[in-house]
């Protein structure tokens, strides 16, 4: 799970750019709706990727359009930590005895902050016990928190290997549960998810793949924090939270930007694993996996025919999470510069499945895919958008094939779609806004460099953290753009 480098040099970017040559979801779970002023309604953005299926495509109006996006005003909020992840957002919640629209973020060293979406003030911060012992060290998290649908609580991860339930009103911890026995080796890198009263978390390792660690899926009771179940991608015959040293195999991180992806119809959990041994029995490195909603059973699996080569050359399949396209189709990228289109019914069951891809296409620039593609269902068509360090591209799904529609050489992190616009953060600096179906550039909003950060868009506002977790800084910036 070694992370290949990317340039972080800041660059000055114009506020508009030319168009380019040459596209959710049944998984959507929009938050509560209330009448408001910024758009037709006020809406929440409760998790990374908008919905449980991580489509990255908001179904809510935003009030931001191609006609007014260039006029947004930016505020830079100074934070006491770097947020190498995304924000989440709840509108009209009670914090400190008053009603606020609030962004919530978790820093790389585990502080979780509530930020007033109107003025950028810090409403509260939660600092986990032991913070001073790891702040400034290699021990980090890049996990985005998730909100409970009741809108009274959020769930956040820390470098100590704990998931915590925090009260929206004041930030106090309701419960705290460990999902690893060795946080010095096992990292919570991916965003948390929530479905049907359960919090879903995954674990990976740190840069350099220092053993021992095993990627695993942890299921927690959202009410009281009980660790209900663990599915281990190595030693998968052991359905418990294991001491990593007690398993003869190591690695197989679950570290993709989208983490655990949930089919909202069945509740099934999809994950992808990184470098590690694969034997098709109890070791599942470099594989795409479907688990039952409680993570007690494996329901389907796929690994490329060259899985041993992927492991040997550090070309993790699990550098990105599975993409649910609908119609039984799943897309799976990787560090080998390829995106594989899979008919998932051919991958059913516990018997091992190698190869049998419907199609293999290149990532936007043919390099590592570390980001979470976005999926847009228009009613008549399905589009997929992806960005890597060297480009951004859009495909349309036709006759079980991804057909390229546009492409450019501007790199980006995980794309999001909101209010009919496609937003892609360039980690060198700048938030690019596109027309999704044509790829025409609408504007570039000025901001600084980052790493895996990505934006959210709701209620006439955009929130985007800056900064790189691997700099080990204890300060950072949250950019908030607002309609004037």
Could you say what each language-model-derived stretch is?
Residues 90-92:
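Beta-strand-dominated extracellular/periplasmic modules and repeats
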Residues 29-66:
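Sequence/structural signature of beta-propeller modules
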Residues 2-26:
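Secretory targeting and sorting signals
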Residues 85:
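Replace the tail clause
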Residues 41, 60-82, 94-99, 110-138, ...:
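Extracytoplasmic/lumenal domain signature
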């Amino acid at each position: 799970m070694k992370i290949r480098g990317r340039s972080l040099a800041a660059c000055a970017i114009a506020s508009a750019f030319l168009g380019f040559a040459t596209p959710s979801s049944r998984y959507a779970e929009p938050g509560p709706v209330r009448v408001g002023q910024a758009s037709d309604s006020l809406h929440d953005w409760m998790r990374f990727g908008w919905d449980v299926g991580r489509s990255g495509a908001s179904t809510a109006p935003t009030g931001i359009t191609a006609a007014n996006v260039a006029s947004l005003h930016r505020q830079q909020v100074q934070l006491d930590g770097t947020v190498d992840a995304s924000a989440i957002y709840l509108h009209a919640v009670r914090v400190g005895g008053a009603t606020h629209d609030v962004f919530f973020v978790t820093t790389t060293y585990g502080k979780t902050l509530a930020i007033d979406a109107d003025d950028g003030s810090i409403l509260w911060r939660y600092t986990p016990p032991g913070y001073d012992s790891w702040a400034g060290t290699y021990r980090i998290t890049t996990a985005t928190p998730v909100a409970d649908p009741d809108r009274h609580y959020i769930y956040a991860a820390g470098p100590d290997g704990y998931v915590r339930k925090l009260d929206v009103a004041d930030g106090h911890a309701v419960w705290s549960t460990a999902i690893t026995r060795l946080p010095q080796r096992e990292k919570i890198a991916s965003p948390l998810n929530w479905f049907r009263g359960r919090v879903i978390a995954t674990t990976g390792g740190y840069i350099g793949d220092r053993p021992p660690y095993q990627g695993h899926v942890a299921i927690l009771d959202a009410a009281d924090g009980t660790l209900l179940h663990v599915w281990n991608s190595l030693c998968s015959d052991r359905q418990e939270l294991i001491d990593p040293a007690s398993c003869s195999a190591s690695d197989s991180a679950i570290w993709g930007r989208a983490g655990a992806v949930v089919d909202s119809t069945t509740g099934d959990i999809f994950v992808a694993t990184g470098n590690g041994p694969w034997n098709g029995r109890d070791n599942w490195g470099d594989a795409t996996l479907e688990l039952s909603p409680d993570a007690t059973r494996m329901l389907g699996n796929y690994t490329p025919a060259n899985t041993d080569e992927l492991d040997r050359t550090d070309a993790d399949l699990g550098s990105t999470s599975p993409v649910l396209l609908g119609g039984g189709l799943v897309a799976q990228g990787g560090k080998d510069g390829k995106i594989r289109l899979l008919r998932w019914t051919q991958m059913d069951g516990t018997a091992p499945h190698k190869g049998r891809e419907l199609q293999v296409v290149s990532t936007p620039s043919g390099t590592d895919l570390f980001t979470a593609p976005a999926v847009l269902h228009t009613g008549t068509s399905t589009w997929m958008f992806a960005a890597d360090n060297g480009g951004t591209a859009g495909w349309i799904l036709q006759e079980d094939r991804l057909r390229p529609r546009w492409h450019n050489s501007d790199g980006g992190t995980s794309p999001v779609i909101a209010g009919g616009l496609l937003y892609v953060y360039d980690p060198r600096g700048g938030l690019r806004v596109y027309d999704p179906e044509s790829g025409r550039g609408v504007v570039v909003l000025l901001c600084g460099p980052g790493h895996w950060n990505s934006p959210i868009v709701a209620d006439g506002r955009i929130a985007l953290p800056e900064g790189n977790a691997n700099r080990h800084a204890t300060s950072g910036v949250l950019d908030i753009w607002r309609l004037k």
